[in-house]
Amino acid sequence: MTLASESLPLSGLKVLSVEFYGAGPFCTQYLSTFGADVIKIENSTQGGDFARTTGPNSLGPEDSLYFQSFNQGKRSLSLDLKDKKGKEVLHRLVAKSDVITNNLRGDKPEQLGLTYSVLKEVNPKIVCTHLS
């Protein structure tokens, strides 16, 4: 973290985001801009966020300007959240995070264990948000 980023309002906030295309990346782009440390969790079984291949692709076939615009300043990790090992990695990250957010459709957060009722067992202080 640089001296400049330490003075931003969300400096020190650790955010996990299970997100793809649209509202999720747009939301966490702002969190990152204001100093939050954002880790984008992408689905390893589907090749990550499909926005990677959304045009224009002037940077390369899987390096979309759209994707780069909404994901600048974030780190990313590819996990299978249906797999036991993927869940273990997610839980280790949740234990060290302040916020987890997602923009998955209605029943997916519950299916993947991304609700407060599940994650409070790992980190009772975690803030869970769901974008729709």
Q: Can you annotate each of these PLM segments?
A:
Residues M1-S132:
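N-terminal helix-loop segment corresponding to the beta1-alpha1 unit
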